[in-house]
Each structure stands twice: as C-alpha cells, then as structure tokens.
Regions:
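Short amphipathic alpha-helices in soluble, non-transmembrane regions
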Residues: 117-122, 217-223, 333-338
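Glycine-centered hinge/linker elements that transmit conformational signals in sensory
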Residues: 216-232, 345
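Non-catalytic beta-strand/loop surface segments
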Residues: 1-51, 75-111, 147-201, 225-270, ...
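Short pre-active-site segment immediately N-terminal to the catalytic Zn-binding motif
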Residues: 50-58
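Short, polar/flexible loop-turn hinges at active-site or ligand-entry regions and domain interfaces
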Residues: 71-76, 123-131, 347-350
Length: 438
C-alpha cells in the first residue's frame, strides 16, 4: 500500500465579480456582470437620491417615490409593472435608504427586454399626477402608522438619528414626517422628481445570463434616448462630532424598558468601517457573542440584545441596545452594555473569537455572491458611493485582514461615553404625572 499524505491546503480564493462598465452620452452609468450558471438576469437600477438629499422641511420624498414609481408611466398603466413581471415568473421590488433608491427586477433571461422597457418607460415618463400623489401619500402615511408610530420601540431609530446627526440630512428617517406629508403639494413632488430621477443621476447594473452585445444594444435602444436631467446641487452634509454625552427618555406603549446607545461611526469604504463591523459582530453576532453570553445568559438581565454598525455614504452609526427582563431596572442593562464596551476598548479579542466572526461574515458574503440581485447590489453600492465599482471585490478581504488590535483601536476612538447618545424607552405607565413634574 502506498504512503498516504495529507495535502497542504493552498491559499483560500474568493469569488470575484467580473464586470465591465461604461457611460451613455446622457450620463447613465452601466455595469455589465455576466454569469451563465442559471438562466436568470437581474436588472438593478439605482438612483443616487435618498432621504439625506431631501429638504429638511419636506422629508420622506425619496421613499414616496419608491411607491410613486409603480403608479404608471406613459405606456404602463397603474400597477401593471407588477403584472408584467410576475406573469413571466419574475420578481421585483424597490428599497430606499438615506443615500439611494433601488429598483430591480429578476426575470428569466429570455425576458431581459421586458425589464428594459419597464424601467426606461418610468425613467422617461413617470405619471407624477395629483391623483397618484394623493393615493400614495395615503399609503405612506398608513405605512408610517403601522411600522413606526404604532410599533413598540418604533420611533426610537428616528430619535437616535435626530441626536446622532443633528446638523446633516442623516438626522431624519426615510419614512419622513407625517406633518411634512400632510403639508406637501404636488408641485413640490414634481420638482423633486425633476431634480433627481434622470439618467445622469442613475446607474444600471445587469447581472446574470445575458449576451453582452445584445444587452448593450437594448440599453442603448431603451435608455439612450432619454434626455439627461439638470446638474444636481446637493445639500452639504455637515457631520458635527458629538462633544458630550446626550441623554433622552421616551415613554412609549411598551411592556419592558429598553436602552439604546449610539455613536457616530465611519462612512462606507473607509478602513474603519470594517474594523467597526468586526467590533459589532464580536459583541452580538450569534448567541455565543459577548452581549448574549453576558446579559442574556449569565446575568439574565436582558430579554434581548442587539448591536450593529451601519456605514452610509457620508457617515455611519454604531448602535447597541438591550431590552430589560421583567423586574430589572434599565440602568442595570445600560451599565452592563458599557462594561462590555469597556472590555472591547481594554482587551484584545482572542484569536478564536475573532476567527469565528470572520468565518460567519465570509460565509454570508460568499453566499450573497450566488444571488444575481446581491451581486448587483455590491457593485452598485461601490459605484454610487465612491464611483469605483471595483471596490466591491475588495470588501471581504479588508474585513478578513482586520486584526484584534485594529478592532480595539477603533473601539477606543469611536465608542466612548462622551461621544454617545443614550435613549431609555420606558412604559407609559412609568411616565411622571403632571403633578409629579410640577
């Protein structure tokens, strides 16, 4: 019998997005990323407009247009966009955040032209009418009631943004203000549409099973004829650092008290984004993470804990939270959160702990690259925020390269008590009466 030897593992290689990009004369940026593993194609269209680009006195417009875009265009009647796509076995949706609005279809590759026609028609000739506006204003107001105003802890995020980013467009949420929705007139909505929804403020990404030359021909046919829009004057985003701790108490329709601690963090594609991602995952990724292990299992003072780092185009927010167990003072939960942050600043994460969070991130990232829509989002985010789609191929390695010392250093620089916004959410039954306040 021959001698058995264990092969030496070689360097790990990760999937790479192979793509090309170009601009149409009207300013539309195009990214082509072919993949023939499955007979599907994703058309992913990003408009570089989010809630931060709105007038502070007229918030919620970017999200409003997430709805308005399905209300009909010159050749597509109201709600027909859904019917066309679903009738050929496709899916579609739209999302809005503080920096961009995303519209996408995933269809059988034989139906690529259908997606081109639908998206180009509403880019060229969306029906921004009084009737459509009134209809969708009512829909958005109801969405706000259900997802924010009538949801336990539903308005905490808005209150955090207001205090973490008091001087920039990041200080309101995408859903916008109910008052602003009520006061808005149709001419203001039309002006917002004219300002932002045109080829030179958009990027189109195709991912999946398509032929390059045919795709380029269709893009030119359907999008090349759309005229460019006006040059965009954006509101400057002034991110004033938090000089001392800000505290706030909210009384809400909740059963259990909660505490939220938030900090300004790093913007997208900065080196610190990846360091703070590691910190947040060490603290809360999985049930063996530090916050779960200490507050939920060991001390049994929290029913639920959470932590994340959200890096946007111009700024970021790092947030951690805990919901108290029955009978536990929320001050104990806050103190425990601060203790875990102090440990992050004082001590290095051990090698096993660090590798575990990296493994989870790596698995999730590689899994996302198996989906045509996720691949498009990776490329679009890099292009829209940094005008460099190639950054999408370096993100995973940047995170895997973060050392325990770099993570600790980021925690020291960003996550200190004097830079925090702290919100306690208490049951309304705990609110002092008017007599107590006097």
């Amino acid at each position: 019998m021959g001698e058995f030897t264990t092969p030496t593992p070689g360097p790990v290689t990760h999937p790479t997005l192979v793509f090309e990009e170009y601009d149409l004369p009207n300013g539309l940026h195009v990214i082509l990323c072919p993949s023939h593993s499955v007979p599907l194609v994703s058309l992913n269209l990003w408009y570089h407009v989010g809630s931060k680009d709105e007038d502070p006195k007229r918030t919620g417009f970017a999200h409003l247009f997430e709805h308005m875009m399905f209300q009909g265009s010159k050749h597509v009647k109201k709600a027909e966009h859904f019917r066309y796509v679903q009738n050929v076995g496709g899916t579609l949706n739209a999302t809005t955040n503080q920096d961009r609005t995303n519209y996408f279809e995933i269809l059988p590759s034989s139906e690529l032209e259908l997606a081109m026609w639908l998206e180009s028609d509403r880019m060229m000739a969306l029906e921004v009418t009084e009737e459509n506006f009134e209809n969708q204003r009512a829909v958005v107001k109801e969405e706000r009631r259900q997802r924010y105003d009538n949801q336990p802890y539903g308005t905490v995020y808005e209150n955090l943004l207001l205090r973490v980013f008091p001087t920039s467009g990041y200080h309101w949420s995408t859903i916008g203000s109910m008052q602003h929705l009520d006061e808005t007139e149709i001419h203001e909505v039309q002006a917002f549409h004219k300002q932002f929804y045109h080829p030179n403020n958009a990027s189109l990404c195709l991912v999946g099973d398509f032929k390059r030359d045919e795709a380029m021909r269709l893009i030119d046919r359907y999008f090349g004829v759309i005229p460019a829009g006006p040059a965009i004057a954006r509101h400057p985003q002034v991110i004033e650092p938090i000089g001392k701790q800000v505290r706030h108490v909210m009384y809400d329709n909740v059963q259990l008290p909660a505490v939220y601690v938030a900090f300004q963090s790093a913007h997208a594609y900065s080196e610190d984004e990846y360091k703070l991602d590691i910190v947040s995952d060490v603290l809360s990724k999985g049930r063996s993470s530090r916050l779960y292990r200490e507050l939920v299992y060991k001390q049994r003072i929290a029913k639920e804990v959470n932590c994340y780092n959200l890096s946007n185009e111009k700024a970021g927010m790092f947030m951690l939270s805990g919901i108290a167990q029955i009978g536990i003072d929320i001050e104990r939960v806050e103190e425990a959160l601060w203790m875990e942050l102090a440990k992050m600043r004082a001590d290095l994460a051990d090698a096993q702990e660090l590798q575990k969070v990296k493994n989870k991130f790596e698995a999730g990232y590689v899994r996302s690259l198996t989906e045509v829509g996720s691949r498009a989002d990776h490329l679009q985010r890099a292009w829209t925020f940094k005008r460099n789609a190639s950054l999408a191929n370096g993100e995973l390695q940047k995170l895997l390269d973060v050392t325990a010392e770099q993570a600790r250093e980021a925690a020291i620089r960003y996550l200190t008590p004097e830079k925090a916004v702290v919100i306690h959410v208490l049951p309304k039954a705990m609110e002092p009466s008017s007599t107590d306040k006097s």
